[in-house]
Amino acid sequence: MDTVRVRFAPSPTGSLHIGGARTALFNWLFARHHGGAFILRLEDTDTGRNIDEAAAQIVSSLRWLGIDWDEGYDRGGPFGPYRQSERFELYREEARRLLANGDAYWCYCTPEDLAAQREEARQRGEVPRYDGRCRQLTDDARREKEAAGIRPALRVKMPKTGTTVVKDRIRGEIGFDNATLDDIIVMKSNGGPTYNFACVVDDGAMRISHVIRAEEHLSNTPKQIVLFNLLGYALPEFVHVPMILAPDRSKLSKRHGATAVDEFRADGFLPEALINYLALLGWSPGSEQEQFTVEELVASFSLDAVSKHAAIYDVKKLTWLNAQYLNSLPQARVVEAVRPFMQEAGYLSATPNPAELDYLSRVVEAVRSRVHTLAELRDASAYFYRSDFEYDDKGVRKHFTKPGVTNILARGRDALSRLPAGRFTVEGTEEAFRQVIEELGVSGGTLIHPTRLALSGRTVGPGLFDIIAVLGKEECLLRLDRAIAWIGANVNNANRTDACS
């Protein structure tokens, strides 16, 4: 294969959505698989919008996903600049070339003229399209319109007979009847380029070898092929990847939950999991394997294994996959990923010291196998950082109201208090509790369940002895004292009140 040069060219008008992220990923994987170049280009010709913040957001999302680029608007390259707003002179130059070659003409039709043409076509039962009336304008007619203050747009003369064939890597050959193609505008009346024109000029000038983009751009392709040929650029290979649909096969939207990369990030998904999931939206690895490292994706990725059928977005599958990564990634990586969540909750300082990070690592070790996201990990860890929690109501009724529960908790507390520091481990505390259970002649749950509730406020979570080991001796004793006092003040008083009524 010749040198691979691919690009991701977002319009910076908002967050990077998963459709765009998947397109960027497929381009990036293809480039890395073939040792080619991946280019980040901004399609920011709409100068009426404030795009700097949106561009920064897109860049941040790509970097968070681990997608890097070889050339781009923020790092330059041999074919820059890489912002369309900085390439207007090139577009004007190429437009002048089309005009000089007789392939384009000035169109003086006003928006009102065009609206009237569309309405006339609808009344005739025809598909509305520009009727080409300005193709044959005389010089005198043009001067008259310009004297009237009408600023023209530049249109390209599209072929009116024959067929334009799109050779798509995924969909095969698709023919478009040239009679259906409008004489498209390439330069607007305000002097700016249109999307189709700027896209072709940029792809041609930047020597893009493969245009890998979303299926919805397929209808633009025959027009762009005509422009490629008129301008004399080498035609890239076109690859239109399938749409991503909601589970009900409707268009994916906000009502289906998070759809933007920064939303998934805020919800506690790992970039490793999201990249893995996006790769499988439309691409088949040809095996039952579901979890891939980035290196495995780069080695395995092939456009020939991309389906032409719509991919179905399934947040349950993504959530499951995220849980797999939470369990399989190195401990240090999960600690790094959850840090901002813990800092936002106030559990970790802005510049944590080694002791804080060591404690966080032990919390993560205890909790991560029971959660699906970093946000869940943060929430499930709350009682490791706060002792002012409320006790679960059902847990109170089930475990704190049993006769003799305060005595049982006190015996467990005494056993923990006698353990030396070197024995205050998972194994050491479990052995101490087993001895108490044997001495009392009760079931294990009789001591373990109320102790869990006393230490965490919850009835489910990590193993009790993992909780004890993480909290440490001093904190465990304080929480057991608090629970014993709370039962005496609340449960026992409530029982006495019930008895008197």
Swiss-Prot record:
It catalyses: tRNA(Glu) + L-glutamate + ATP = L-glutamyl-tRNA(Glu) + AMP + diphosphate. Keywords: Aminoacyl-tRNA synthetase, ATP-binding, Cytoplasm, Ligase, Nucleotide-binding, Protein biosynthesis. One of its GO terms (cellular component) is cytosol. A motif ('KMSKS' region) lies at residues 251-255. GO terms for molecular function: ATP binding; glutamate-tRNA ligase activity; tRNA binding; zinc ion binding. One of its GO terms (biological process) is glutamyl-tRNA aminoacylation. It comes from the Bacteria. A motif ('HIGH' region) lies at residues 10-20. Its EC number is 6.1.1.17. ATP binds at K254. It is found in: Cytoplasm. Belongs to the class-I aminoacyl-tRNA synthetase family. Glutamate--tRNA ligase type 1 subfamily. Monomer. This is Glutamate--tRNA ligase. The gene is gltX.
